[in-house]
């Protein structure tokens, strides 16, 4: 539809290049910014209700009234022109569901929080700050290497519950510093960070700081610096903790600092994963200078799959490496949610009916993602002209392959438990609802924050499980005098030098992957919701 007197939608902001070599950026409420050419940017800046001929005279060569009309039609289709195609944005909300795996709560505008120190951030030497941060990062790694014995004690032995609380509280505080590292770096380059807040990202609590204004920066290296600032900041904090720990005498205080340092380093490392929208992805996107890299790579990968499976014509629009990158991006969320299900399911099942429903919803969503992926592939192939018979055959082959994998791939059915000693001997401590077989081999361990150390072995004796009060530290890596409800069985043929209580692993016979999934996830959920036993 031709717009006789085009006017830019009032909620659209057009940013001129910040410096030579930078891009024109169009900012839209609750949407990703658009990068446009200089000619389109100039046109958008002049759309004030005049007719195309008047606009063409003001803009000069190469614009004509016809070119202005054609460009306005395309901009109108994007919702940038005032009129029926440009719906007014909804009021800015504090709580935003970005996707089923990302829920955000906006707390405050980061640029306002950083305003008091903005002059300092602008004047700071970027090279000096980077050198200092890298020196702390490397110095911390050297400090950890020099404290091997204390590090093993901190990561591989039970710690007080207060130590765990301090480590995770410190990690939460460091996450806030991490995000402000992004905002501070963008501010240094004369950009303006957006919202700061907290979010649930793939079932994991986290913070965020919007730095989409970084697309206005002239150099890709500046955008990479903004993306990597959080990781470098967090790793520098980890290095500080490790070096301080080297000056602290042995004990729980030293273990707290070492545990906090390692957890921070690992958190920074996880943020480098480029297959989900973490810092590593943002840095990669900035480095290759391809906006919406992940979405476009996944589209490229789907097109490549259609070509390989059905012979549908594939026109490559991105570098060849984006195909394997896109395939990994497609499958990675399923992997992350699967790990999250394994991590949280036993905790949630301990919450009763509500926890059982949550686990069921999580497993259902995992299944939905898998089915949706196959359905999307078949639907796109059908739209490209692939016959129904070939599509049906492909679906049958894919489902048969999944069935064969679940049937013939065997996994170890180990059960995590604990042990405790008293005057009557050593007993296996089981979480409620766990079933084991008499005579099964048991590894007795000392559990810690990151890993366990084998102390000995035993076998499960005959008899019925006894419901009783057990040490909480037998089921967790916490050193505490708290007790909880659990089930116990006698252990026989005990060998090794054992702690008073600790972790245990019951070695189970290998079983098909499908049976293992049902035994460890589906049946416990069924029992929790419907209260039925085998």
What are these regions (language model features)?
Residues 1-29:
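Long, low-complexity, charged/polar intrinsically disordered regions in eukaryotic proteins
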Residues 30-117:
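Long, charge-rich, low-complexity alpha-helical segments
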Residues 118-133, 213-234, 305-335, 388-395:
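Loop-to-transmembrane boundary segments
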Residues 160-314:
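Membrane-embedded catalytic scaffold of the fatty acid hydroxylase/desaturase
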Residues 388, 406-534:
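Hydrophobic alpha-helical membrane-insertion signals
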